[in-house]
């Protein structure tokens, strides 16, 4: 798990066994940014969703296939980060989660600040700077 902000964290794939610990850490929402069946052995989001309900966590399924970033996904992520609930987002490596967060965050903050936060979380999205500038300008 990598901290992006005090209220937004990203991670690689989780399992149902991880959910109780995530709940103990004070998260209120888990977001799945990964479609089912990307690889053998991946825990289906429905199992994660059920376990979230059993642990009083809100679950949101926002699957993003690699290379299929949409304005709808960005808008939904924007809504999430504006709620300011402690949110745990996961995908295969965390890269899709941090990408969606960055695209949403530039609507609120400067691109350079956003990329700095991304880098501090251990990711490199500098190649998306022009794209993020376009989102910021729109």
Protein language model annotation of sequence segments:
Residues 88-98:
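A phosphate-binding catalytic loop at a beta-strand-loop-alpha-helix junction
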Residues 1-88, 102-138:
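Cys-dependent protein tyrosine phosphatase-like superfamily
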């Amino acid at each position: 798990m990598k901290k992006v902000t005090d209220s937004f964290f990203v991670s690689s794939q989780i399992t149902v066994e991880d959910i109780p610990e995530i709940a103990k850490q004070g998260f209120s929402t888990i977001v799945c940014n990964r479609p089912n069946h990307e690889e053998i052995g991946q825990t289906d989001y429905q199992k994660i969703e059920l376990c979230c309900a059993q642990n009083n966590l809100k679950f949101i399924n926002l699957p993003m296939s690699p290379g299929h970033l949409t304005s709808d996904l960005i808008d939904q992520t924007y809504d999430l980060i504006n709620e300011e609930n402690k949110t745990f987002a996961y995908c295969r490596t965390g890269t899709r989660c941090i990408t969606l967060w960055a695209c949403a965050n530039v609507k609120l903050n400067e691109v350079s600040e956003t990329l700095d936060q991304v880098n501090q979380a251990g990711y490199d999205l500098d190649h998306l700077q022009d794209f993020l500038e376009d989102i910021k300008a729109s």
